[in-house]
Curated annotation (Swiss-Prot):
Organism of origin: Arabidopsis thaliana (Mouse-ear cress)
Tissue: Expressed in seedlings, roots, leaves, stems, flowers and siliques.
GO cellular component, one term: nucleus
Protein name: Protein DEHYDRATION-INDUCED 19
PTM note: Phosphorylated within the NLS/NES region.
Pfam families membership: Di19_C, zf-Di19
Length: 206
């Protein structure tokens, strides 16, 4: 392999690597500038044109008219386009990336819309805090939720019963203590009366 063929292969390799760096993202643009191939008159965007010339017109790529600036070029046409019109690669790449950003935004909006519809169908709270009014709670789901509440409800009743028992006991004590005092009073009076009777009977006998 001679030096010219090696140089030619190295040029092809570096050119293909550079074109891969500016590789476009799939999808059509609203406006995309196209250029006619100087050898077969087919139209391509700037990246497609360079790839087409590299693939189809490698041997005849010298001494052609540049489709961008319409000047006759004495060197390799692809090398001329990449060196003198490199801004077109960047511009096309920006357009593609901008379109891909728009597509991703649209897909996100569609996803949010789908999730919002799903939340409304299931009766969950929406993002602005409102609840779907048309959805009624499922009785089957509520029956699964309610047992936990009913199991925890007897505890307050038990505490209530204990407090009521204590209050009743206190009332009993209050009622019992006056009765016992009265009994004691009556017993004391009776004993005094009996003592008087006995003393009077004794004194009468004397």
């Amino acid at each position: 392999m001679d030096a010219d063929s090696k140089r030619f292969l190295a040029t092809l390799r570096s050119r293909s690597e550079m074109l891969m760096g500016f590789e476009e993202i799939d999808g059509d643009d609203d406006f995309q500038e196209e250029f006619a191939c100087p050898f077969c008159a087919e139209s391509y965007d700037i990246i497609g044109l360079c790839c087409h010339i590299d693939d189809e017109h490698t041997l005849e790529s010298k001494n052609a008219v540049c489709p961008v600036c319409s000047l006759k070029v004495g060197v390799d046409i692809v090398a001329h386009i990449t060196l003198h019109h490199g801004s077109l690669f960047k511009l096309q790449r920006k357009r593609k990336s901008r379109k891909s950003g728009t597509n991703s935004t649209l897909s996100l909006l569609r996803k949010e819309l789908r999730e919002g519809d799903l939340q409304r169908l299931l009766g969950f709270t929406s993002r602005n805090g409102s609840v779907a009014s048309s959805v009624t709670p499922d009785p089957l789901l509520s029956s699964f939720i309610s047992p936990t509440r009913s199991q925890s409800s007897p505890a307050p009743r038990q505490t209530k019963n204990v407090s009521e028992d204590k209050q009743i006991e206190r009332k009993r004590q209050v009622f019992i203590s006056p009765v016992s005092l009265k009994d004691r009073e009556e017993r004391r009076h009776k004993s005094e009366f009996v003592q008087r009777l006995l003393s009077s009977a004794i004194f009468d006998e004397v």
